[in-house]
Amino acid sequence: MPYLDAAGDMRDIFAEYIHAKTLWIDTEVADYQSRQPRLSLIQVLDDPTDMSGDRVYILDVLQYPNIVAEFIQQIMCNSQIEKVFHNANFDLKFLGGKKAQNVTCTLELAKSIPYYLLPLPNYQLKTLATALCRFNYIDKQEQGSDWGRRPLTETQIEYAYLDCIYLAQVHLQLLELQVASNPDPKKEDLTALDARYQDLLTDWQLLKSEFEHLEERLKKAMQAQNVKETSVCKLTSYERQTVKVPFSELVNLVQNDNLSLDFPVTLTQKLQKDLGASWQKLPVEIEKNTYLRLSQKKNDAIQE
């Protein structure tokens, strides 16, 4: 885990990184709860097979805003290099924002995996690393430590480099899950899909029915007992207001006040019926959309 705090050394490693295909990156921020947070460290791993930390470079950029700018220009804005983060939106606040190109976020990647393949209570890096990679006893206590202090403690440095290792391993596992959850439709085994669909259908109908019934019972019970929260649920209420006006009155208002009001109106089946054949005199624009609906075939066999 090389720790670099000299501008020249950091520029040397940038020269290596511009040839990388993928970089796994994390950051540590000083004064992150203040109005002026400062980027303290940039941790970079260029070899996902490294579990020792030898290829995790810790760049101490606290006093080098110019080095951060160079990193953004040479690495973050380089579309040829994939940059992998967890919760990339946070890191990009300090590393180029919208200028950054070819960024992968493992948080968003995890969210895209169907829940049944990744049934986790949350998608924090610690949770993912434990569930997918069997990294146990991950200590995130140092995350909220003082990253503006110098020198950093050994515990802080260990925490910083380990996060890159967790990130890379989680990324690789998520890529495998992504492939598993998106098979080629042309090669799918329809017989196997049919069988699994049938297996789940009855259980799903029962579960859905019970769940919806429980929701209604909970709402009624909480209202009747004047309870706003239970250990699991929270009851909230809201009002929805709809403003309606007769169409003729709207037309009169537009004409009388000489308003410039022009927008398309969807001619529903009811409106078409009310207008009769007259609607065909209008300069309509017809949009056609195709939707697919999956339904269970009815059993035509006579049951006695």
Predicted feature locations:
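Mixed-charge, glycine-rich, non-catalytic linkers/tails in nucleic-acid processing enzymes
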Residues: 154-215
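Extended, charge-rich alpha-helical segments
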Residues: 205-304
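Exposed alpha-helical structural elements
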Residues: 9-13, 67-71, 124-128, 155, ...
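Residue-level signal for secondary-structure boundary elements
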Residues: 22-25, 118-121, 137-141, 172, ...
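Conserved DEDDh/DEDDy metal-dependent 3′-5′ exonuclease domain
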Residues: 2-5, 18-23, 32-166
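N-terminal accessory regions of nucleic-acid-interacting proteins
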Residues: 1-27, 302-304
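Residues that form generic nucleotide/phosphate-binding pockets
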Residues: 13-16, 74-75, 128-132, 196, ...
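A broadly conserved detector of short glycine/acidic/proline-rich loop/turn motifs that flank catalytic sites
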Residues: 29, 63, 171, 239-241, ...
